Structure formats: C-alpha cells, structure tokens
C-alpha cells in the first residue's frame, strides 16, 4: 500500500490523524530522542571497551559476559516488535492461549542451560552448523543448515519484525514507512557492524529494562481503565463490534464473538484454534528448535564467562518470559474492550477505514492502546520500547547471521582467509542483509493484515522439526551418523516445504472466506503437523543410521551426552582440512615490515574493530591454554547449587502457570 492510497483514509477519518498528532509533543519527542542517544552511547562504549578485533571477540563477546546481560539479551532477542503486535493481536482475537507459547520457554531454557550448552562448550564451537560438522563430519550438513538458517532469518524473523514495526510506525508517527524503516535499519546496522556481539548484548540489556518498565506502566493504566482483573474477564466476553453486517451480507456470529474458551490455555484437541496436544507436544518441538539449536539464542550463551553464568542467564530469561502473558497478550484483550469497533472490526469497509486492510485490525491492538491510553512522555517511552524490541531483534539476527555466513560458508570458499578478512566479510554480509531487509519491505507491506505473521508462525512448524530431531539425536544417541542425519534433514525439509508452498498457493483464508486448500494437506493444524514431521524425521535418521557405518568413539569425545566427561583427546572427523591459514599469516608477519598507518586508516580500523595490534601475539602454549579455558565447563560448587535450585523453582513456576490458566 503506497502513500497515495493512505492519504484519502487519513483525511476522511479523524482517528488516524489524531493518532499522528498525539505523538507530536515536546515530552514524547524528547523521550524518543534521549532514548536513541543513550542506545548509541551504549553501543559506542561497547565498541571502545571490548575486543572486537578477533572472531571470538566480535562474534562471542570474548566469552566474558556475566549472567544478567545474557539473560536480558536472550529475552530481548526473543521478544521483538512481532510479539507486541502479533501476540497482542492474537490475544484480542482469541484470548490467552498464545500466552502458553511463551510459557513453554520456561521449561526449554532449563534444557538449554543444563543439557545443550554444556555440550556446545565442550565441543568448542561458535555456530550450530559447526557443531554438526564436528559431530558428523563432511561439509554437506553444515552448509545445508547454514543456508537454511539464513533463509529462515531473512524470510521469517526479519520480515516479521519489519511487518509489525511498520504497523506501529504507520499508526503512531504517520511517517512514510520506507523512510522510518530505513532510518531504523541504518542505526541498527551501524552499531551492530561496529560493536559486535558485546554491543548487541549491552544494548539488549538496556532495551529489556525499557521494555519491562514501559510495559508494566501500560498494564497498570490499562487494568485501571477497565476496572481491574474481574471486570476485564467480564467485559472481554462482551466486546462485540457495533457493525456486524453490510449490504445484504450477514457475518457469521463466530467471526465477531469472543471465543467461549478465551480464558483457557488448554483448548479442545479437535475444534480448538490452538489444540492442547499441539500446545504441549508440538510447541515443545518448536521451542526445542528455537531455544536449543538456534544461532541467535545459543550464541548469547556461548559468550558467558563460565557455565554457571550460562545457567543463571537462562533462569533470568525464564522468569522474564512469565511476563508477556500479562504485559502483551492481555493488553491486546484490553484494547479490544476499550476500542471494540476499531480492534474487533469485521465489516471490510470499516476495517479498511481504521487500519488500511479489509480482513481485520487486531494487529493494531497494542499500538492503539499505547497511543490512546498513555500520557505524554510515557507514550514516547512506549514508542521507544517498540523501536527497542524491533532493533534488538534485528541486531541479534544481523550478528548471528553474519556469524553463520563467515564461519560456515565463507571459510569454505576462502580456506586461507586471514582473521581480518573474516571480520570484513562478516560486516559486509550484514550490509547485504540490511539491503535485503529494505527490499523485503514492500512485500511485507502488501501482505493483507496479519496473514503474513500467521504464515511466519506456521513456517517454523514446517521447517524447524527436522533440525530439532537431528540435534536431539546427535546429542543423546551416539549411534547416529552423517548419512542418517543428512537424509533425515532432507526428507523433513521436502515434506515441510511441500506443505508450506501449498498453503502459500491457496492462502490461509479468513473467517468469512475460508481457504480452498485441500483438507488432507491444510486441514492438519500446524502444531500437529510439527509433531508428525518430527516423528518422520527421527524415524528416517534412526533407520538410515542403523543401516550405515557407525562413527568410532574417538571422533565423538565430548560431542554427545554419554561421552561428555571424556578426557581423551578427540580426533575430529575431517581433521587435516582445518586450521590451514595460520602459517601464511605468520610468514607475512615476519617477512613484511609494517607500514605506519595514516590517521584516517587508524580511525577506520578502530571504528570497525579491525585494529589487531593490541598486545603481543599469543604463543602456541598460550593458545592451547586459551582453547582449554574456552571449553571448560567446571562450576564453583556453591554457585552450581544456587543455579540448580533456581532451575527447579523455574520449572515449578511453569507448571503452576499452566495449571492455573488451563
């Protein structure tokens, strides 16, 4: 939708114009400007205070992070603007069930910190495809998974965040969507390219604090406005729009009436929009893929100074994940109560008048609440929260995607690439991602209402389960080998992509216009499909592995659970093909005298973290000691006990939340 089609709508109705004008006051603008200045200052501080001149420094923050920035960064990387728009929108449409998606993470972060990360640390890996390459050997799995992960980042995570950020920017600022998003991406890319993972984690920590404070304040205002929690539960069930027919068309009652099970997480296994077996089992598969094998998440854990800090960071993230149900999902429901005709509209012409699309306006639930309910200054703070969540998610994706490209793809193309060349390649790939992000904006913008967001939720069900199956078996069953893992991934991908393409071709439809997609393909709920795909992938991996040659234990020490404490030296599969770039580097260091750099070259190197002249070069013995430290998973007994107790408490909190709202 271009600006020409928007202008008649904004002039014909007072509401959008009033929304734009509400934000244009000194208090709101001052808060937004101060926020962006603080974020840039934090990024610059990280740029000057951390070592970004090495791959480990730029991509893993030098493995020196403590628990609280890790926990905050895990949370901020997960909670993007897509959550504020998508979760609140789904809450407005169907109730609290999507909050169960968030609570599933409480269990999975414990699995991440106690099971998966110790294996990754002992393996001495930087990326997830690198782990599979060490575990199985060969190149095809590593390269396949790297490319698939990059595609998932570009066409799900980036597009979801830009789509939801676009909705918010249009509603609140009235800026041209392309101008606003390009400015955001430039600022985001700037401090990610210059600061590396340390800048991302520190800015994530700042943005998590802003998100929580702003959202808690909004929640207080919202519940006060509706008269408390009891009144909220009563009024939501009566939040029916005033216009429910147009012309000679009568809209079915189910399209505008709140669901009877709106305040239940566990819904009917057949008729429920989110069936309870799918939520319990299907969602667990998707959260296993996301929290335990996704580069964005695991990379933050690998930056911790020791395993206790990993576990404590996971626990902090888990406690924070309790909040989205109350701060986001229920806020969408409150928005439906307060602005029923706008948020819950069903008449196409009315919906187009309010939000520019004909199939529904639930996606504007959270932004509308912010613009209409918050006082000056606090409204600016909440806009900052939305921009913070958009930027933190994008920075996480940019940094992790460039890590995947640099470590798993570029090193295969340029086997003798120097450290400096790898750093430059990673930064250039980030610029490429930013370009794709901007090019993707019109595609995202042309998608009707929240349908693209719905697609994205289901895309993970079609592409994630085979990856989760392979990682799970790789860690817990040492008999799995490379052919089994590869064909499990390939078959799972082919089945998943077939369902995805079919659904894209037919469309998901809407309440009034159901999709024509064949029931045998699209009739299976995407969470049930995830379970089926996961089981098929596991069977394929197991059968092919049993019919092919096993991997000797000498190649598996510290790569799987049963051999995690082994002290023997591991001989990597495909050893001898790696680590071939150091000799040429050393030769050039000794043979070629270094020229004195000019002022502008030194400033450029400092800005991009390419100044590698800090301190003497490590000896072979020092490098070996450093490698040993980076693969160390020992913990202080006291802190191990403290994090273990907190882990049990977190699991108990998860069980209580599910039971109370079941």
From Swiss-Prot:
Membrane-crossing residue ranges in chain numbering: 25-47, 67-90, 96-117, 140-169, 177-193, 203-221, 276-295, 310-331, 376-406, 423-444, 452-477, 482-504, 526-547, 643-660
Major site of localization recorded for this protein: membrane
Extracellular-facing ranges: 1-24, 91-95, 170-176, 222-275, 332-375, 445-451, 505-525, 661-662
Residues linked to a glycan: 248
Disulfide topology: 255-511, 255-608, 345-351, 355-361, 517-522
This protein's record includes keyword Secreted: no
UniProt activity-regulation remark: Enhanced by the interaction with PDZK1IP1/MAP17; but unlike SLC5A2/SGLT2, PDZK1IP1 is not essential for SLC5A1 transporter activity. Possibly modulated by cholesterol binding.
A single MF term (Gene Ontology): galactose:sodium symporter activity
Swiss-Prot/TrEMBL site (Implicated in sodium coupling) positions: 43, 300
Subcellular location: Apical cell membrane
Impact noted for substituting residue 460 to W: Decreased affinity for glucose and phlorizin
GO biological process: alpha-glucoside transport; D-glucose transmembrane transport; fucose transmembrane transport; galactose transmembrane transport; intestinal D-glucose absorption; myo-inositol transport; pentose transmembrane transport; renal D-glucose absorption
Residues annotated as site: Involved in sugar-binding/transport and inhibitor binding: 460
Side Cytoplasmic, residues: 48-66, 118-139, 194-202, 296-309, 407-422, 478-481, 548-642
Amino acids binding D-glucose: 457
Family per similarity comment: Belongs to the sodium:solute symporter (SSF) (TC 2.A.21) family.
Functional note: Electrogenic Na(+)-coupled sugar symporter that actively transports D-glucose or D-galactose at the plasma membrane, with a Na(+) to sugar coupling ratio of 2:1. Transporter activity is driven by a transmembrane Na(+) electrochemical gradient set by the Na(+)/K(+) pump. Has a primary role in the transport of dietary monosaccharides from enterocytes to blood. Responsible for the absorption of D-glucose or D-galactose across the apical brush-border membrane of enterocytes, whereas basolateral exit is provided by GLUT2.
Protein name (database record): Sodium/glucose cotransporter 1
GN (gene name): SLC5A1
């Amino acid at each position: 939708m271009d600006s020409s089609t928007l202008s008649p709508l904004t002039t014909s109705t007072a509401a959008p114009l009033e929304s734009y004008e509400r934000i244009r006051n000194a208090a709101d603008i001052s808060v937004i400007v101060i926020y962006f200045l603080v974020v840039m200052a934090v990024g610059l501080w990280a740029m000057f205070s951390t070592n970004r001149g090495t791959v480990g420094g730029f991509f893993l923050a030098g493995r020196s992070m403590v628990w609280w920035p890790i926990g905050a960064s895990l949370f901020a990387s997960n909670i993007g603007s897509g959550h504020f728009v998508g979760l609140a929108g789904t809450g407005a449409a169907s109730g609290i069930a999507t909050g169960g998606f968030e609570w599933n993470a409480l269990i999975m972060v414990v699995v991440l910190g106690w099971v998966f990360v110790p294996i990754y640390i002992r393996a001495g890996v930087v990326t997830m495809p690198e782990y599979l390459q060490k575990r199985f050997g060969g190149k095809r799995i590593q390269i396949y998974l790297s490319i698939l992960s990059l595609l998932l980042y570009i066409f799900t995570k980036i597009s979801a965040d830009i789509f939801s950020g676009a909705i918010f920017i249009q509603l609140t600022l009235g800026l041209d969507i392309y101008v606003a998003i390009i400015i955001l991406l430039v600022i985001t890319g700037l401090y990610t390219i210059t600061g590396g993972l340390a800048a991302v984690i520190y800015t994530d920590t700042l943005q998590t604090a802003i998100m929580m404070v702003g959202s808690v304040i909004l929640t207080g205002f919202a519940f006060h406005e509706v008269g408390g929690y009891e009144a909220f539960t009563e009024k939501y069930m009566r939040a029916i729009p005033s216009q429910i027919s147009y012309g000679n068309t009568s809209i079915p009652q189910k399209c505008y009436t709140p669901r009877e099970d709106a305040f239940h997480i566990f819904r009917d296994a057949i008729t429920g929009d989110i069936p309870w077996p799918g939520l319990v089992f299907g969602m667990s598969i998707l959260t296993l893929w996301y929290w335990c094998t996704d580069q964005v998440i695991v990379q933050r854990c690998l930056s911790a100074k020791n395993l206790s800090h990993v576990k404590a960071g996971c626990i902090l993230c888990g406690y924070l994940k309790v909040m989205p149900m109350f701060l986001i999902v229920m806020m969408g429901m409150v928005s439906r109560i307060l602005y029923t005709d706008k948020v819950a509209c069903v008449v196409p012409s009315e919906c187009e008048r309010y939000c520019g699309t004909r199939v529904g306006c639930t996606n504007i639930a959270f932004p509308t609440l912010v613009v209409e309910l918050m006082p000056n200054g606090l409204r600016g703070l909440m806009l900052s929260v939305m921009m913070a969540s958009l930027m933190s998610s994008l920075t996480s994706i940019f940094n992790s995607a460039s890590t995947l490209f640099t470590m798993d793809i570029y090193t295969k193309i340029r086997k003798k690439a120097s450290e400096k060349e790898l750093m430059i390649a990673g930064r250039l790939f980030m610029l490429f991602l930013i370009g794709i992000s901007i090019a993707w904006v019109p595609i995202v913008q042309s998608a009707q209402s929240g349908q693209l967001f719905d697609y994205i939720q289901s895309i993970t069900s079609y592409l994630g389960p085979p990856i989760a199956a392979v990682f799970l078996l790789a860690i817990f069953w040492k008999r799995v080998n490379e052919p089994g893992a590869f064909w499990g991934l390939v078959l799972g991908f082919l089945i998943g992509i077939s369902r995805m393409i079919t659904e894209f071709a037919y469309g998901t439809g809407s309440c009034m216009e159901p999709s024509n997609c064949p029931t045998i393909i699209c009739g299976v709920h995407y969470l049930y499909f995830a379970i089926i795909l996961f089981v098929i992938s596991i069977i394929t991996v197991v059968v092919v592995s049993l019919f092919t040659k096993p991997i000797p234990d000498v190649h598996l020490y510290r790569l799987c659970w049963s051999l995690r404490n082994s002290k023997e030296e591991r001989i990597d599969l495909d050893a001898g093909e790696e680590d071939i770039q150091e000799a040429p580097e050393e030769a050039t260091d000794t043979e070629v005298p270094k020229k004195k750099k000019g002022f502008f070259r030194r400033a450029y190197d400092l800005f991009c973290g390419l100044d590698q002249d800090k301190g003497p070069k490590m000896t072979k013995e020092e490098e070996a000691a450093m490698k040993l430290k980076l693969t160390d998973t020992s913990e202080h007994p006291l802190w191990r006990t403290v994090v273990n107790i907190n882990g049990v408490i977190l699991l108990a909190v998860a069980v209580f939340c599910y039971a109370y709202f079941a």
